[in-house]
């Protein structure tokens, strides 16, 4: 006769096993699927001929034209990019890559956002976890991401936040697991027409859309006073990645991806993280190249114009980047000295930026903390405010140190687009007015190099008031 307690334990074990199977099913088939991540994972699991693997986030997926690079360097390449993937995802996807492939080179592609936190967003987890082959690897990846933020329940029950909305979406997800490429061809007419999966992990975006408005409205220089460096957890994961690659017998290259110029000029820590990563790699036998410091003769700065959002380029830009990478990598493989293609440090890089990327306006608050990112002196702004008796708006811009900017303010009619001058061109970038005189109205500022030609596209619209949101562009 079985002991009652033992029967209870068996029932509990059966319940937990059943729950685990239900959760695993829901997290696999009942969540929305990133079509391009699914295709990437399906192809990498089917391949065994990969000689060079690029591992990273959507930056890899959208910018490394693997087939083009393969033809140019004479080695079979694959772009293993998972959107929103951080180092935990890079480690898990590389383990998946190594199940059937033994690449000669594993190139870990990192951007500052990869190392500004040790946490991987659930968005990256839901793109990757369902497509890992082994339940053990799924659990190992799940634990690696959950231990950093403590979201064990949220991460275990992904389907609560990313559930399919219809039976059709459910069947689409099932199809992407069982017959991914046939399903892709079937549903392709319903997908974003701008995006095409080209194979070997590369997804190409073809659109006339550009990030001009996003750059204008969002990339505003900040000052935090914070010292940016790699987190201890980040250092541990980088060493874990190095050891994983070494155990496979592959050669590692850490590649710091070059984002658009405005990011380098404006975002706190953007270049600091890259410099910290370069130092860490040098101290730990990890070859590293910082493409953020690539000179125009290697990587043309005109690629800024090919971004369709703040981080991703259209296919033309990806082709230019891929060609630049090929030029570098072929020389690197040949043992050539490539140092002349790169600026020695950030100051040399900054000095090479001889233009203005974007400008903006912000309100001065006498009682608030001084904005250390402003080029104006605190005394000049305070004097213009007459001890808070007048409203003051300060204009600034992202530019290289060789550029001396000047600004001109206008009052803009949002309905017609008509502009009335408020100032002449001035280097101070300060607009002062009677208290409340411009509240709720639209101020437009233009920026240019002092004495230079006007650039009608280099402007910023600003509505003083409670919300202080950018004006509607007409």
Specify the residue positions occupied by each region the protein language model found.
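Membrane-embedded segments
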Residues: 55, 59-146
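Surface-exposed, short loops/turns at beta-strand junctions within beta-sandwich domains
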Residues: 432-441
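Hydrophobic membrane-insertion alpha-helices, especially the h-region
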Residues: 7-28
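Short beta-strand segments within Ig-like beta-sandwich modules, predominantly Fibronectin type-III
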Residues: 421-428
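Active-site segments of SGNH/GDSL-like serine hydrolases
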Residues: 242-269
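Secreted/periplasmic serine-hydrolase-like ester/acetyl group-modifying domain
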Residues: 125-248, 340-361, 370-374
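C-terminal regions of proteins
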Residues: 266-360
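Short, compositionally biased P/S/T/A/G/V-rich stretches that sit at domain boundaries
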Residues: 348-386, 418, 461-474
